UniProtKB/Swiss-Prot annotation:
Top-rank lineage group of the source organism: Bacteria
Annotated protein name in UniProt: Lipoyl synthase
Keyword Transcription: no
Keywords, sorted A to Z: 4Fe-4S, Cytoplasm, Iron, Iron-sulfur, Metal-binding, S-adenosyl-L-methionine, Transferase
Organism: Maricaulis maris (strain MCS10) (Caulobacter maris)
Gene encoding the protein: lipA
Amino acid sequence: MANLIDNTARSAASDARAARHPEKQKRADTPVLRKPDWIRVKAPLGKTFSETQKIVKDGGLVTVCEEAGCPNIGECWEQKHATFMILGDTCTRACSFCNVKTGLPAAVDTDEPRRVAEAVAQMGLNHVVITSVDRDDLDDGGAQHFVDVIEAIRAATPSTTIEILTPDFLRKPGAAEAVIDARPDVFNHNLETVPRLYLSIRPGARYFHSLRLLERVKDRDPAQFTKSGIMVGLGESKEEVMQVMDDMRSAGIDFLTIGQYLQPTRKHAAVDRFVHPDEFKAYETIARAKGFLMVSATPLTRSSHHAGDDFAKLRAAREQMMARG
């Protein structure tokens, strides 16, 4: 086993050269907590990992696995699972928790839907997760591109189930509806944190707008599964987490994910504490009691981790619920 790759150890000179986060360079370094023993992952090695890496590279594609520094990349890529990040590698937002590059994005690549669909077919995916950067520069926030990708995958591999993890489409009238009408199997949009921390952690977003986005999915297509997640370890209280759960259930959200926040670099928000695995188990118990069909709550839980297996469980849970009447 190997510890997580620690990007926080990079020097200031290295950060400046990389310039992934130009808006963060003037921020003071934040303290870095030593990771506990329970946060351990396998090093990304093996033939299948390399094969997945080659498919992504040859297709000129971007994955959130790489861009966000996901700790589960070794496990997922060894199983030929990858989360494709469309609409480029540059985000128009500057959330203090996120490792994705920020700045002025390039023009939309209209050939990307074809290449994503081709990669899905090459990898033999039964379930695929598609996410994107925020594209506040586009009139529709990138909604039509999501639709194009969904349609391309359905044309190439009709049996593949599709999960999308979308931006909030803030101030983009009709954008969310266009994506909902493309009928992905799972519509995911992460609330990320509790309302009190939005200004410091997710300053470009609005908590109740994000919540309403997920509610609109259910209003427009009640059969569509909805999913959302939060990070813990940012300074939230247990009571605040439980209130978020209640808000999500009021919006009809089916699937909740809760994972430990991990600090990408010293210029990002600091970890307030590492939440013990027993606390995650308690959160899972509480969430299930509140009526979520599916809950994943562990230190290394991420939105797309085990997404295919979880989708099968989610669908089975709904069928059981309907059978009970």
